[in-house]
Swiss-Prot record:
Species, as recorded: Mycobacterium tuberculosis (strain ATCC 25618 / H37Rv)
Taxonomic placement: Bacteria, Bacillati, Actinomycetota, Actinomycetes, Mycobacteriales
Full protein name: Nucleotide-binding protein Rv0566c
Assigned keywords, A-Z: Nucleotide-binding
One Pfam family in the UniProt entry: DUF520
Matches recorded under NCBIfam families: PRK05412.1
MF GO annotations: nucleotide binding
PANTHER family: UPF0234 PROTEIN YAJQ (PTHR30476:SF0)
Reported function: Nucleotide-binding protein.
Family: Belongs to the YajQ family.
Keyword Zinc in annotation: no
Presence of the UniProt keyword Nucleotidyltransferase in the record: no
GO cellular component: cytosol; plasma membrane
Length: 163
């Protein structure tokens, strides 16, 4: 029997993030407590979101609204990293970045976790910004997926190419 495998990746569906951003922008435009604060949310480049408002409290609340919309769209908050509010003139601004890809540090943590706690006949390979897990038994692969979902890692994980 051939080996079964799957890949562990950390990718965010940009269209879902765009939908969450548009929903947050709509809510910020219509909510009573944001009236007159000139609160806005927009893309800044390809992988960053910029929120601006007239007060520090309102910009923090806008970040919370955006995070709420990300959760509703099934996007892990581990994939979004918001910065601190910065004063710029009469407005406050927060820039948040989307984190994609598994860093080499996190890939090493994942492979070590699988080696230490996972089934014994499971092999891992680091391939750029993803990790491939192979085994002869599919049950072992499913056990690895369950273990990684329970593990507290600081990166959002998706499991793709399950064969």
């Amino acid at each position: 029997m051939a080996d079964s495998s799957f890949d562990i990746v950390s990718k965010v569906d940009r269209q879902e993030v765009d939908n969450a951003l548009n929903q947050a922008a709509k809510e910020l435009a219509t909510r009573f407590d944001f009236r007159g604060t000139d609160t806005k949310i927009a893309w800044k480049g390809d992988e960053a979101v910029e929120l601006t408002s007239s007060t520090e409290e309102r910009v923090k609340a806008a970040v919370d609204v955006f995070k709420e919309k990300l959760i509703r769209r099934d996007i892990s908050l581990k994939a979004f990293e918001a910065g601190e509010p910065q004063a710029s003139g009469k407005t406050y601004k927060v820039t948040g970045a989307l984190k994609q890809g598994i860093s080499s540090e996190n890939a090493k943590k994942i492979t070590k976790l699988i080696r230490d706690a996972g089934p014994k006949n499971v092999k891992t390979q680091i391939q750029g910004d993803e990790v491939r897990v192979t085994s002869k038994k599919r049950d072992d692969l499913q056990a690895v997926i369950a273990m990684l979902k329970k593990a507290d890692l600081d990166v959002a994980l998706q499991f793709v190419n399950y064969r």
